[in-house]
């Protein structure tokens, strides 16, 4: 029965308890083994197998052995009595496993080690720490950063006491799922009402993806492709407005109320507003929203603390001029004036026949006297102004004279007020004029000097005077703003440096962008074609370029200047963003602005975008007249590298007569078309000599006939002079 009972119990603990119960009935007692009672010879136990077998043999034996008690030394009676006198200890209460409290894991999450959370700002709201941990650990967003915009004054459009969090999602699906879970978590945990702009719901995203797949399947069956630029799914950007939470306000309302002379409307914001910007990696790099707010915060902190604005890191090289400000006095300005650059009255860059060798000669060596020289060596110029000349007409007089004379009248530098008659009269009238008019006229004077590449007038000087004008709350008109922007974005490329200086310095562009920010706060329209075109041209190369990987060993390709591939791609990224702004804002360009855009695209070898813009002119309803076609062929005749698009260019020739009004070929058009033919088909002369019956040969003969005739064909107006 005992064996059957033991074999029927499978649990080892139960079997042990049953054995103990039977052993207690049989009279065998279990004595505790005292480690201190063993002798020195008994400290090492026998082998495990022998000990186990002998002990079990004695335990389950029915005949007690005589030496059964030898295994254990008897305890002294004194010790037994002491144990009996000692009160029994209360046994610890047994707690079942289902009632035991689980200890939280103290090990940190592996993502937290790889992606540390940004440090909390001063006086953070209580929700901020938990929100950051939820975004990083639970949602799995990367590259988390935090911007404290509570000190921004005036506050941003999103609200006062703003804290902005940025996070990068791994894809479009991860972006939508993370934003949806974040909103649900905020509603459930903190009872907030977040607003997510750009979020597609769970079912909405599935429906859109299903519809997109269905349209793609239908388009594939119809042997066509989907050409929709934006399907509304891949926005890559979701803005979650958490709302206003308690705590964390930067200024206390009672401190603001104690301000002396405080006048305003509205109420104080009790709490902090939190906004979470979730983007994909590509969208975050393209928008650079974090960098925009960071620069705005830095400029605002400097303004509020009364510190000077950030200037250009390098000494100002105005308009790309490589000359440094000189300390030459007007008495010795004759040599400096002789080397000034020739600039047209409207300050536009024009291409023409180079006469640099003649312009760079000294006045004495060339024998040309632009102005009489006094016996003491100074330039004797006619009086530019008189006592009766009004202040508003003084700066306009500088535009009506040659650049050499204008540079002389402007004196040594921006601090010069009396070295010339013009400056003496100008600042004398300036002291008697109203403050706003005086500030505007001084800005205009510095703008003219910068456009003339005067070495003593810098763009930082113009920015400083403009900031004083803004701080004084003087009015700014759109023409005045455009004049300031032209001066800040003016640049003269230097092809003699190593490497060539072909781009506007980043410091000059930063000054222009800061001016645009200030003007935008005054209500002036910035999303127009004029401002956009100036920024687009200012961020581009000013000469035809070609990208190369090895700039040191790059060969010369026609008239194109080699530039490094990294610089070329950086400029193209900026221009791509500006083109997206133009498309999103629906900016319409004028005819002259289209010409500037075409030139920049052609100089950058953006031939695909170039021809798309050419077609855009016709779609905009603008007539493509003779001047536009002359510009098109002249642009291709001056450069090369476009041979892959020669068929597209030659297809424009039959399109001329289909324009409204038609454009007929005359001598001017025939000359530039013939030059383009020679570049696109170098073997054209051999084919003409063989008199091949091809369209190219017929076009060449047509151009030859138009050139030989001294009058335009088919009644074209204004025939050009005969080509020798």
Swiss-Prot record:
One of its GO terms (biological process) is mRNA stabilization. Probable mitochondrial mRNA stabilization factor. It is found in: Mitochondrion inner membrane. Belongs to the ATP25 family. One of its GO terms (cellular component) is mitochondrial inner membrane. Keywords: Membrane, Mitochondrion, Mitochondrion inner membrane, Transit peptide. It is a peripheral membrane protein. Residues 308-319 have a biased composition (Low complexity). Residues 36-76, 300-323 are annotated as: Disordered. Residues 1-52 form a transit peptide. It comes from Blastomyces gilchristii (strain SLH14081). This is ATPase synthesis protein 25, mitochondrial.
């Amino acid at each position: 029965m005992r064996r059957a009972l033991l074999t029927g119990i499978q649990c080892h603990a139960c079997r042990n308890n049953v054995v103990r119960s039977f052993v207690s009935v049989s009279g065998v007692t279990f004595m505790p083994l005292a480690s201190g009672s063993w002798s020195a010879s008994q400290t090492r136990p026998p082998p495990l197998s022998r000990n186990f077998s002998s002990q079990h043999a004695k335990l389950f034996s029915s005949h007690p052995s005589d030496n059964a008690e030898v295994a254990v030394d008897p305890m002294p009676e004194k010790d037994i009595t002491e144990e009996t006198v000692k009160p029994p200890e209360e046994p610890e209460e047994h707690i079942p496993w289902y009632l035991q409290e689980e200890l939280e894991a103290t090990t940190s999450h592996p993502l937290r080690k790889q992606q540390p959370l940004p440090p909390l700002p001063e006086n953070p709201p209580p929700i901020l720490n938990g929100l950051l941990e939820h975004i990083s650990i639970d949602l799995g967003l990367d590259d988390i950063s935090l911007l404290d915009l509570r000190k921004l004054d005036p506050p941003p459009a999103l609200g006062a006491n703003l804290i902005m969090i940025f996070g990068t999602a791994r894809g479009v699906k991860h972006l939508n799922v993370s934003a949806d879970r974040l909103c649900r978590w905020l509603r459930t945990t903190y009872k907030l009402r977040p607003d997510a702009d750009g979020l597609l719901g769970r079912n909405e995203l599935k429906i859109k993806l299903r519809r997109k797949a269905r349209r793609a399947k239908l388009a594939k069956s119809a042997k066509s492709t989907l050409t929709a630029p934006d399907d509304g799914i891949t926005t890559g950007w979701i803005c979650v407005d958490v709302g206003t939470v308690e705590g964390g306000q930067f200024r206390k309302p009672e401190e603001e109320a104690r301000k002396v002379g405080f006048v305003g409307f509205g109420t104080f914001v009790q709490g902090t507003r939190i906004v979470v910007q979730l983007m994909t990696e590509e969208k975050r790099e393209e928008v650079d929203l974090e960098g925009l707010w960071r620069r705005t915060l830095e400029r605002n902190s400097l303004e509020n603390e009364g510190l000077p604005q950030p200037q250009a890191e390098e000494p100002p090289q105005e308009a790309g001029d490589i000359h440094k400000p000189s300390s030459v006095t007007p008495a010795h300005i004759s040599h400096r004036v002789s080397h000034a650059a020739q600039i047209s009255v409207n300050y536009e860059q024009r291409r023409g026949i180079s006469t640099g060798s003649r312009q760079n000669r000294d006045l004495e060596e060339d024998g040309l006297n632009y102005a009489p020289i006094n016996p003491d060596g100074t330039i004797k110029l006619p009086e530019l102004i008189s006592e009766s000349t009004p202040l508003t007409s003084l700066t306009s007089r500088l535009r009506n004279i040659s650049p050499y004379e204008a540079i002389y009248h402007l004196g040594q530098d921006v601090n010069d007020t009396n070295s010339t008659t013009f400056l003496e009269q100008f600042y004398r009238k300036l002291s008697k004029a109203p403050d706003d008019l005086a500030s505007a006229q001084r800005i205009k004077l510095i703008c003219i000097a910068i456009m003339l590449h005067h070495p003593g007038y810098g763009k930082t000087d113009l920015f400083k005077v403009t900031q004083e004008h803004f701080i004084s709350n003087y009015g700014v008109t759109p023409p005045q703003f455009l004049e300031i922007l032209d001066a800040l974005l003016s640049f003269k490329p230097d092809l003699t440096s190593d490497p060539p200086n072909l781009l506007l310095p980043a410091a000059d562009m930063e000054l222009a962008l800061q001016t645009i920010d200030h003007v935008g706060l005054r209500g002036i329209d910035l999303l127009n074609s004029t401002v956009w075109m100036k920024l687009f041209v200012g961020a581009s190369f000013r000469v035809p370029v070609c990208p190369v990987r090895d700039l040191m060993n790059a060969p010369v390709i026609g008239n194109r200047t080699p530039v490094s591939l990294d610089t070329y791609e950086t400029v193209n990224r900026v221009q791509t963003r500006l083109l997206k702004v133009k498309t999103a804002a629906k900016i319409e360009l004028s005819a002259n602005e289209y010409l500037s855009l075409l030139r920049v695209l052609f100089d950058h070898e953006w031939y695909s975008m170039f021809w798309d813009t050419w077609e855009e002119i016709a779609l905009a309803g603008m007539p493509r007249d003779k001047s536009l076609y002359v510009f098109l062929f002249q642009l291709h005749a001056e450069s090369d590298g476009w041979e892959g698009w020669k068929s597209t260019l030659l297809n424009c020739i039959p399109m001329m007569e289909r324009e409204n009004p038609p454009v007929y070929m005359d001598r001017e058009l025939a000359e530039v078309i013939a030059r383009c033919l020679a570049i696109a088909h170098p073997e054209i002369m051999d084919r003409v000599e063989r008199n091949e019956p091809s369209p190219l040969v017929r076009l060449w003969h047509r151009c030859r006939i138009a050139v030989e005739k001294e009058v335009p064909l088919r009644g074209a107006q204004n025939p050009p002079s005969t080509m020798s």
